[in-house]
Amino acid sequence: MFNWAKQQLANVAGTQEPIYGPSAIKSVAIEAEKTPYTEVTRDGLKWKAMDSTSVETESFYITADNGYIALAQVIYSNVAGIRTTCQFNCKVFDKDPTKPHLWASTPLNNQDFNEDKTSFYADDCAVELSEDGTYYTIKSMNSQDAIVNLKITRSTPGFQAGTTGTTLYGTDHNNPWGSIRHAFWPRCVSEGTITTKEGPIDLKGKALFVYALQGMKPHHAAGRWNFVNFQGPTYSAIMMEFTSTPSYGSTLVNVGGIVKDGEIIHAGAMSTATHTQVKKDSENEWPEPSEVKYTWSGATKDAKPVEASIEGPLGERVDRVDVMAEVPGFVKTIVAAAAGTKPYIYQYHPKLSLKLKIGDEEIVEEGVMFTEATFIS
C-alpha cells in the first residue's frame, strides 16, 4: 500500500528523481561569464502563468524607517497542469522584538492578468506595474488581519544575472524540462501601510522586489537556499543562492549585486554565502546558522574591481517557518516519508555592516539585513 501511495505521490509531486549529474543543469553563471548582468525592463517582468508544474512569485521585502520589516507576496502555482492556486502572503516583524510577528496567508480567487501580463488581479487583490515600469502598487483586502496598500518605486535599475537570469534543468539544454529565473529591483522606495487590527503600520522606507519562477517541482529544483537583503542609507546588497538537489550534482548557483541610488555598482553570479558557525536545531536536525559571511566580487561598468562582504553574528532568529505546516497531516506524513523532506526557513534581521571596496575606495556602511536560510532536502 505504501509503495503504491509513494508512486501516486511521485506522479503528482515528483518525490523521486534519478541521478542525472551536474551535466543536466546549466547554471546562469555560464551566461554571466560573458555578460555579468542585464538590466530588467518592463517586458522582463511579465507573469508566465505556466500550464505545467511551476511556482511563480512576486515578493516585496520592506525595511521601514521606523524599524518594522515586512513582506508582501503573491504566489501563483500550478500542480501537474491539473490545478492552479494563488495565495497572498503578508508578514510583518514588529520593531519590538518581544512582540509576535504578524502573518496572514490567504488563498486568492478568480485570478487574472492585464493584457501584457505585467499586472496581477484577483478578488480584493491587485499587484500592478506602472505603465512606465518604475513602480508597483500592491493592494489586498483579503485578510482583515492585514489590509495592504503599498507603493514600491525603484530607485536604481532592475537586473538579472547573465542575459536571461535563468538556470536550466535537463539533459538537453536546448529543450530543458525545468528552470529557475530571478529578477530584482535591488533598491526601492516604499510608501504606504499595512493595516492590522491594532491600526495602520507606516512602511515608509526602503524595499527590494524579487520576481522568481521555478518552472518545475520546487523540491526537484533545489535542496537549500540562502537569501540576503541588506539595505543601508546609501547602498543595498542582495543575494539569492540555491543548491540543486543531488539529482543535478548538488550544483551551487549564486546571483547577487551591489547598488546605490540610480546605479548598479556590480551584479552577476560571483557571490558567496557561508554559514561560519552553525548549531543543530534540536527539533529537526538542520544546521541552523548563527554566524555568516556573504561576499560579492566583480567589476563596475568602467572595469574598476569591486569586492564586498557582510559578516557577523545573526543574533536570535526572528522566525522558523515550517513550510509544510499548512499541509494536511496525512499528506504531510506521506510527503515527508516518501521525499525525505522536512523543509524549514530560518529568518533573521540583524544590523550589520557592508564593507565595500570599489577600486581604491573603501566604504563601510551599517544597515539592516534581512536574511533567510532554507533547508529542504
Swiss-Prot record:
Ceramide-binding protein that may transfer ceramides from the endoplasmic reticulum membrane to the cis-Golgi network membrane, and is thereby required for the biosynthesis of complex sphingolipids. Residues 1-18 are annotated as: Peripherally associates with membranes. Belongs to the SVF1 family. It is a peripheral membrane protein. It comes from Gibberella zeae (strain ATCC MYA-4620 / CBS 123657 / FGSC 9075 / NRRL 31084 / PH-1) (Wheat head blight fungus). The lineage of its organism: Eukaryota, Fungi, Dikarya, Ascomycota, Pezizomycotina. The keyword ATP-binding does not apply. Keywords: Cytoplasm, Endoplasmic reticulum, Golgi apparatus, Lipid transport, Membrane, Nucleus, Transport. InterPro entries: Ceramide-binding_SVF1, Svf1-like_C, Svf1-like_N. Signal peptide: none annotated. Pfam families: Svf1, Svf1_C. The gene is SVF1. It is found in: Golgi apparatus, cis-Golgi network membrane; Endoplasmic reticulum membrane; Cytoplasm; Nucleus. One of its GO terms (biological process) is response to oxidative stress. GO terms for molecular function: ceramide binding. This is Ceramide-binding protein SVF1. One of its GO terms (cellular component) is cytoplasm.
